[in-house]
Amino acid sequence: MSYQLDNGEVVRHEGKFFAMIVCWLLGNGCLFSWNSMLTIEDYYVYLFPKYHPTRVLTLVYQPFALGSIAILAYREAKINTRVRNLTGYTLFFLASLALIILDVATSGRGGIGVFVGVCIVSGAFGVADAHVQGGMVGDLSLMCPEFIQSFLAGLAASGALTSALRLITKAAFENSQDGLRKGAMMFFSISSFFELLCVLLYALIFPKLPIVKYYRSKAASEGSMTVAADLAAGGIQRSQDGAEEDPKLPERLTNKQLFLENIDYAIDVFLIYILTLSIFPGFLSEDTGSHSLGSWYALVLIAMYNVWDLIGRYIPLIERLKLTSRKCLTVVTLSRFLLIPAFYFTAKYGDQGWMIMLTSILGLSNGYLTVCILTAAPKGYKGPEQNALGNLLVMCLLAGIFSGVTLDWLWLIGKGW
């Protein structure tokens, strides 16, 4: 299959499977650094026992992510998507490298100064996340649903991979001197390398794939100005002024109109993540009591969440199991709030088996609902509108995360902090 541009150039419509692999890797890179920081929470709890690092680092991360995505979503129609995404991945790489430099410079010591430095890096991760997650979801929303599903699966895979690596490094270094620190440094070294790989993938490989050029050319023909630089990187030159002035192009819906037409999706995404982040990772890391797994317990819970979140993001690929009814999506989203009393009473009275099961349900439902909503919402819109809607939904997602992280502190009531 091919697509003919206005200037007569033909763009081939092929390479879908390879593009899905690249989307998966780019999704992985979007959260790999942040998940690495979360997954070595036992190292930071050891270094900064008085500062609740799991909760504080997440709370620092979110305002930067939410503030950045709000600005970027408002200006998305005029932002160069290529520069935006490359800026995000480069910032992930530099921030991951900064954590290694900070730890080496301080010889692995704790203290308030070092903790402030780690918090600054956490804020940088938030800014990078807003650039990449909003930019990529918006960009992939104007392509086929399989691409956005692969990207979202990559987001979850980063959590599963970092959890698996953390369990391996904990086992490998558990009995060695300075084992926690060695495991953490290995994590950030891998993270830095992977983020650099994502920079190269997005800069040199992704824009040159035929099917990606096809969808971006189609979006440009519908009036999208955000794809021009990526098309140029793929060898296709288009006039941005022509797209802006062409009277034949139908007017796109405003961001406000798009938001109101999809307000149920926006609320669903917000509620999904306010619930998830009010439990994960803070509650699972600090408030689940002592059990036979000892120091492995929190790591196992986080790993189970990440694995089932990943599985949940692949279930919608089976068409019969994909939830498309907007009312049903809202009902299922609201029903997840029953998990709050379930977690509370299980932490107080239940054993670790029940807690692992609840954590798995939390992850499975989070991944499944996220993919169902973000793949269904862009259907029926033109390219520029799909890009805008993708950014708006990511803004709601990050708003939900920020609210959930804030509410997570309520679990500390009555614990003397």
Identify what each model region corresponds to:
Residues 51-52, 116, 134-135, 141-157, ...:
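Loop-to-transmembrane helix entry/capping segments in MFS-fold secondary transporters
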Residues 1-26:
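Cytosolic juxtamembrane N-terminal segment immediately preceding the first transmembrane helix
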Residues 30-42, 280-287:
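Extracytoplasmic
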Residues 57-69, 125, 129, 144-198, ...:
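Glycine-rich segments within core transmembrane alpha-helices of 12-TM secondary carriers
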Residues 16, 94, 102-121, 204, ...:
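Membrane-interfacial loop- and helix-cap regions that link adjacent transmembrane helices
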Residues 41-54, 79, 102-113, 146, ...:
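Extracellular/lumenal inter-transmembrane loop segments of multi-pass membrane transporters
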Residues 64-87, 92, 310-327:
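Helix-to-loop junctions at the C-terminal end of transmembrane segments
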Residues 122-143, 148-149, 366-381:
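Intracellular juxtamembrane helix-capping segments at the cytosolic ends
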